[in-house]
Regions:
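C-terminal hydrophobic helical "lid"/dimerization subdomain
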Residues: 1-4, 285-337
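NAD(P)H dinucleotide-binding glycine-rich loop of Rossmann-like/cofactor-binding domains
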Residues: 72-79, 87-158, 302
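N-terminal Rossmann-like NAD(P) cofactor-binding module of classical short-chain dehydrogenase/reductase
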Residues: 95, 155, 201, 223-224
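Short amphipathic alpha-helix with an adjacent loop that forms part of the alpha/beta core around
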Residues: 207-217
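Glycine-rich phosphate-binding loop and adjacent beta-alpha segment
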Residues: 192, 230-303, 337
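Mid-domain Rossmann-like dinucleotide-binding core that forms the NAD(H)/NADP(H) cofactor-binding site
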Residues: 128-206
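Glycine-rich beta-strand-centered segment in the early N-terminal region that forms part
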Residues: 30-48, 56-100
Length: 337
């Protein structure tokens, strides 16, 4: 059997700010051989998420940091090419923590999920946008904590991103009025015209507190926060009575490591509001419920997904940096094969 070549990107030093070329190295090794109970997966798409940048810092998080010399962690999708595990057959499509790697080993555990249906018929890009951690995060954050009701006003930051674009559409399906916050006219146009938001505020060019007052005259009932920082503070200043603030991400501080405290947090008390952080991995046992709802809405034509696709493993670091420079709309993917 010819040996398969496996190219991977490993961490060489801790980045400061954006990931620099010398922070990582592209290495070539042999693909691993599956042992009993394991299968070998050839990665087709690597998903690029802002959280992946936080795993490169030597800081405690819900997952341990990537060690120097280790493959950079990322969630991806691929096809089983060899199996010694009863849970997987050759040709199955699987979502797992592929990392920045062309091949990876999976076991029958919570880090790998077979995608139902014949492998060649699976829309892998839709799976990465809707039926993986991204879709589950939008679903559980919006339905479990946000709980939008018909007629309520929902605000979503990073509304043009992978999670935000889906979260806002879930709120629309619930009958809420949805206002996005995004950076730049092109993103704001996509948020309204593609993702179906009622309005979008351009935080780079608009006066945010004034725009929130205009678009949310009765206040904000639900805020789905992906950014933290001054944007979170501005929305906290506009909360309605009994508002729910969903803390999903803090992309504004992932590069700096600084977390300026929101001065308007006192409004949580004044408005008897709730602010709650969450991680979709806590709901792992209910992912099927999320995907069933998302599949139903997708089949009914109620969900739109968009991907920004880079080509080749060499592009992984550029794709990750692109999340922090505002380069991408929708889910960022790198196609490997």
């Amino acid at each position: 059997v010819p040996t398969l070549t496996n190219r991977q990107i490993v961490l060489r030093r801790r980045p400061h700010g954006l990931v620099a070329p010398e922070d990582t190295e592209l290495v070539e090794t042999s693909a691993p051989t599956p042992a009993d109970g394991e299968a070998l997966v050839r990665t087709t798409y690597v998903g690029i998420d802002a959280a992946a940048r936080t795993w490169l810092d030597d800081q405690p998080s819900y997952l341990p940091p990537v060690a120097i010399g280790e493959v950079i962690r990322a969630a991806g999708i691929g096809v089983v090419v060899e199996s010694r595990c009863p849970a997987y057959s050759v040709g199955d499509v699987v979502t797992t923590l592929t990392g920045f790697s062309e091949y990876t080993i999976v076991r029958d555990d919570l880090f790998a999920t077979p995608v139902p249906g014949p492998g060649e018929q699976v829309d892998q890009r839709a799976v990465m946008s809707l039926y993986g951690p991204t879709g589950a995060t939008a679903y559980f954050g919006m339905t479990g904590i946000g709980k939008p009701a018909p007629g309520e006003t929902v605000v979503v930051s990073a509304a043009g991103g992978a999670t935000g674009s889906v979260a806002g559409q879930i709120a629309r399906i619930a009958g809420a009025r949805v206002v996005g916050i995004a950076g730049g006219p092109e993103k704001c146009r996509a948020v309204v015209e593609e993702f179906g938001y009622d309005a979008c505020i351009d935080y780079r060019n608009d006066d945010l507190p004034a725009a929130l007052k205009t678009h949310c005259p009765r206040g904000v009932d639900v805020y789905f926060d992906n950014v933290g920082g001054p944007i979170l503070d501005a929305v906290l200043g506009r909360l309605a009575h009994k508002a729910r603030v969903v803390l999903c991400g803090v992309i504004s501080s992932y590069l700096t490591g600084e977390h300026p405290g929101p001065a308007n947090y006192v409004n949580l008390l004044a408005k008897t509001a709730l602010m709650q952080g969450f991680n979709a991995l806590d709901e792992w046992g209910r992912f099927d419920e999320a995907f069933a709802a998302l599949r139903r809405w997708d089949a009914e034509g109620l969900l739109v997904h968009r991907e920004h696709v880079y080509e080749g493993i060499e592009s992984c670091v550029d794709a990750l940096n692109g999340l922090f420079t505002g380069a991408n709309i929708g889910k960022t993917l790198v196609r490997l094969g």
